[in-house]
A protein has these predicted regions:
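Amphipathic C-terminal alpha-helical segment
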Residues: 117, 173-190, 202-214
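N-terminal intrinsically disordered/low-complexity leader segments
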Residues: 1-30, 158, 211-215
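Short, hydrophobic secondary-structure boundary micro-motifs
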Residues: 52, 126-129, 192, 215
Length: 215
């Protein structure tokens, strides 16, 4: 798969002036998607703090009036961009966790999907795990909720329902995120897929031994 292809697919084609031949709500959705992609690209390249609304307009090919019809400010646009980044990453993880296979195989597939998606989509990765910290309280709260969702998904896949098991699941997800973030900050995207195997070992020793059904 081409690097960055998942993000490019979200942008779609540019709409030109006049009659688009599509429903108004589809035009609105397409404009919002292009601005979200534009924010992801700009934040990944410049850092969120340095991004201006003009940067997003240039990449999305929309007017300033259109921008403010969708978003109150830059932070609101970034929140939509972050949600898009989450969707790109979680779609592949969700498919792996929903597979009809033993717990360990589903967890292995989810980790593979997580690291391979971040490696394939470097701009998404930067927004998802790095620039999110610079974008304000509302976005940070969304990021914490996203990580809690990861913990729920992993704990659920392994049947980790006891409080102590939940803490271990939280620690494992914390390690996954921290290791990925360190590589992304360093620009070492190629190293991301190689993190899966050692983390699987940690999952085996910390979680699966507490869940006979998953062994």
């Amino acid at each position: 798969m081409e690097r960055g292809s998942l993000l490019k697919a979200k942008a779609g084609g540019k709409l030109h002036g006049g009659n688009h031949g599509i429903a108004p709500e589809e035009v609105v959705a397409a404009q919002r998607a292009r601005m979200s992609v534009g924010m992801i690209e700009a934040a990944a390249q410049k850092g969120y703090a340095a991004v201006t609304v003009a940067d997003v307009l240039e990449r999305a090919g929309v007017s300033r009036m259109t921008f403010y019809q969708h978003f109150a400010n830059k932070e609101a646009c970034f929140l939509a961009a972050y949600d898009m980044a989450v969707e790109i990453v979680m779609t592949r993880i969700g498919a792996a966790l929903a597979a009809e296979s033993p717990a360990l195989e589903r967890i292995d597939g989810a980790l593979d999907a997580y690291f391979s998606t971040l490696a394939q989509e470097p701009e998404v990765a930067k927004v998802f795990l790095v620039e999110v910290y610079a974008a304000g309280t509302a976005v940070l709260q969304r990021r914490l909720a996203t990580q809690a969702g990861f913990v729920d998904a992993f704990a659920g896949a392994l049947g980790a329902s006891l409080p102590d098991q939940r803490v271990v699941a939280e620690a494992v997800i914390g390690a996954v995120v921290a290791l990925a973030t360190n590589r992304i900050v360093a620009g070492d995207f190629g190293a991301l897929p190689g993190l899966r195997e050692p983390l699987m070992s940690a999952l085996i020793t910390k979680l699966v031994r507490q869940d006979p059904a998953g062994s």
